[in-house]
């Protein structure tokens, strides 16, 4: 037979997960019930649900697109909200995550009572980072930044592996600052900002963009590097972009399969031959063929680079230059609409005309 405490927990879970009419959910009676059950946070009801990746999440008036359950716990701990701490633990949050944001002895004692360790080692802190960053919502990214970017446990120099991970993520796109000259706090901030752009989380992008305007061109840099043509288009059309279009193209070429942003820069007037050269320097065969599709003709210069790098695959491709020709179906469209570009260059349907020619010539 269920105990009163388990019945109470079950009742709260049912209330938090049920779907009711909008009219009743806003009624005074229903709101009173939720408040009495402790299902009220930041001026609104708490809802428990799962996202498309089957991850448990918390929603409320302040976090409408959801928080990963453990991130919600860390926020409740920071706010010293005993009721919500106990509630989120009942729903499956890991009490050890609370040690990241605990700031009073009373709440630390509560965490111990609920089974928390005395402290987290560097590997457990790293596990917290991996867990919370997997959840893709604007609310979650913003709160991760606010809770963790200036957190002593995350800033500790003992967390060598975490620092390596952040540095690795930033190093490939840190073109307008020297990584060794900025604090780890700023690196974490730039990392969370980049995640917002990577997953096109528009609310989070606007949050970081307004708050960190002194991070010169960082949003643009991330949009180019992470193939976010939607955000690139918004910036290029609505804001004054201070970066040269050829420098933008070079950034678009730093990752494989960045077809959408490469195409967009090309349509804005970037030099496709320079993009071809960058692709060969990086040994990105997919980008090389895409540049040829867009009419690039820098075969001789690229061949010299490939020979210097002893890049056998690129050499084989480049010596067949007389077989290739621009793909008129790409060039003639001259589109800059992000949605149309992504449809045109969809990963599952787009095939390079010249790559097919090369493969056909090497079939036998």
From Swiss-Prot:
One GO term of the biological process aspect: taxis
Top-level division of the source organism's lineage: Viruses
Pfam entry (one): ASFV_360
Entry's family note: Belongs to the asfivirus MGF 360 family.
Function (record text): Plays a role in virus cell tropism, and may be required for efficient virus replication in macrophages.
Protein name (Swiss-Prot/TrEMBL): Protein MGF 360-1L
Organism: African swine fever virus (isolate Pig/Kenya/KEN-50/1950) (ASFV)
């Amino acid at each position: 037979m269920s105990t009163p405490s388990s019945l109470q927990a079950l009742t709260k879970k049912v209330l938090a997960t049920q779907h009711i009419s909008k009219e009743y959910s806003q009624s005074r009676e229903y709101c009173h019930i939720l408040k009495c059950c402790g299902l009220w946070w930041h001026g609104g009801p708490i809802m428990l649900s799962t996202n498309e990746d089957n991850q448990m999440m918390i929603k409320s008036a302040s976090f409408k697109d959801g928080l990963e359950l453990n991130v919600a716990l860390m926020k409740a701990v920071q706010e010293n909200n005993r009721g919500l701490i106990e509630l989120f633990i009942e729903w499956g949050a890991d009490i050890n995550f609370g040690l990241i944001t605990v700031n009073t002895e009373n709440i630390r004692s509560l965490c111990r009572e609920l089974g928390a360790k005395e402290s987290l080692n560097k590997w457990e802190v790293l596990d917290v980072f991996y867990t919370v960053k997997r959840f893709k919502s604007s609310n979650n990214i913003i709160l991760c930044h606010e809770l963790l970017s200036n957190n002593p446990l995350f800033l500790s120099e003992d967390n060598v592996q975490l620092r390596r991970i952040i540095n690795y993520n930033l190093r490939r796109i840190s073109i307008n600052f020297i990584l060794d000259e900025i604090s780890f706090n700023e690196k974490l901030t730039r990392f969370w900002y980049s995640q917002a752009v990577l997953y096109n989380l528009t609310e989070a992008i606007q949050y970081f963009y307004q708050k960190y305007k002194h991070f010169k061109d960082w949003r643009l840099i991330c949009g180019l590097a992470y193939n976010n043509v939607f955000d690139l288009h918004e910036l290029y059309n609505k804001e004054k972009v201070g970066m040269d279009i050829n420098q933008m193209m070079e950034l678009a070429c730093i990752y494989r399969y960045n077809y959408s942003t490469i195409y967009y820069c090309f349509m804005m007037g970037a030099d496709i031959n320079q993009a071809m050269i960058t692709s060969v320097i990086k040994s990105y065969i997919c980008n090389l063929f895409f540049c040829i599709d867009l009419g690039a003709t820098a075969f001789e210069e690229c061949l010299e680079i490939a020979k210097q790098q002893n890049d056998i695959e690129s050499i084989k491709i480049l010596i067949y230059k007389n077989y290739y020709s621009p793909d008129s179906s790409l060039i003639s469209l001259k589109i800059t609409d992000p949605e149309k570009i992504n449809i045109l260059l969809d990963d599952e349907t787009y095939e390079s005309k010249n790559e097919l020619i090369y493969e056909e010539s090497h079939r036998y």
